[in-house]
Amino acid sequence: MDLYNMSGSPSTRAVMMTAKAVGVEFNSIQVNTFVGEQLEPWFVKINPQHTIPTLVDNLFVIWETRAIVVYLVEQYGKDDSLYPKDPQKQALINQRLYFDMGTLYDGIAKYFFPLLRTGKPGTQENLEKLNAAFDLLNNFLDGQDYVAGNQLSVADIVILATVSTTEMVDFDLKKFPNVDRWYKNAQKVTPGWDENLARIQSAKKFLAENLIEKL
């Protein structure tokens, strides 16, 4: 099973932790988006949308992080605990996954990812939208240990990958006490956390080295 990815990206880290949870190993193939490798003909042939991560499982090809993690748990999970078959539980998990994609991850991407290109974060408006996204997550977690229901799910894993991106930058989660509490617990109960943290540290080192060149 091949995973075309960029190691430190939140999307890749979400897939890697999910794979760890279901006991799947990948042949990891790095695609450097900073130099445009995702646009090379060989990769566009695999994924016309030229996005990473992209999973190739025999002749089956799937991309988009949240689609990949759901596929992995449904295809390889030993049970349905990470993505229950109950329609209402599944719907809640889906809602949290869509919230991550359209609001939380989007907020982090628009505020922090410009650092990779310019050495400076996004605008004050971007920061306000990011704080609003964390306020929503903080609300979701009021009185709960997990983001969707009463047990660890793929929604926790994906959102953990997103939130842990703040380890690379100066962002205080203590402003959001429910998120901070959940984040500390999620590190303890999520398979693959240590590997996730190692990838973050490598990405942080890369970021620091490149920031020095840009400043």
UniProtKB/Swiss-Prot annotation:
SUPFAM superfamilies noted in UniProt: GST C-terminal domain-like, Thioredoxin-like
CDD domains in the cross-refs: GST_C_Delta_Epsilon, GST_N_Delta_Epsilon
Broad EC category: transferase
EC numbers, comma separated: 2.5.1.18
Domain GST C-terminal, first and last residues per copy: 86-206
Binding residues annotated for glutathione, in chain numbering: 9, 50-52, 64-66
Pfam families associated with the record: GST_C (PF00043), GST_N (PF02798)
Domain GST N-terminal: 1-80
Gene3D superfamilies on file: 1.20.1050.10, Glutaredoxin (3.40.30.10)
Keywords per UniProt: Detoxification, Transferase
Cellular component terms per the entry's GO annotation: cytoplasm
Residue stretches spanning the membrane: none
GO MF annotations in UniProt: glutathione transferase activity
GO biological process, any: response to toxic substance
Catalytic activity, as annotated: RX + glutathione = an S-substituted glutathione + a halide anion + H(+)
Keyword presence, Transferase: yes
Family label: Belongs to the GST superfamily. Delta family.
UniProt subunit comment: Homodimer.
Role played: Conjugation of reduced glutathione to a wide number of exogenous and endogenous hydrophobic electrophiles. May be involved in detoxification.
Protein's name according to its UniProt entry: Glutathione S-transferase D6
Species the sequence originates in: Drosophila melanogaster
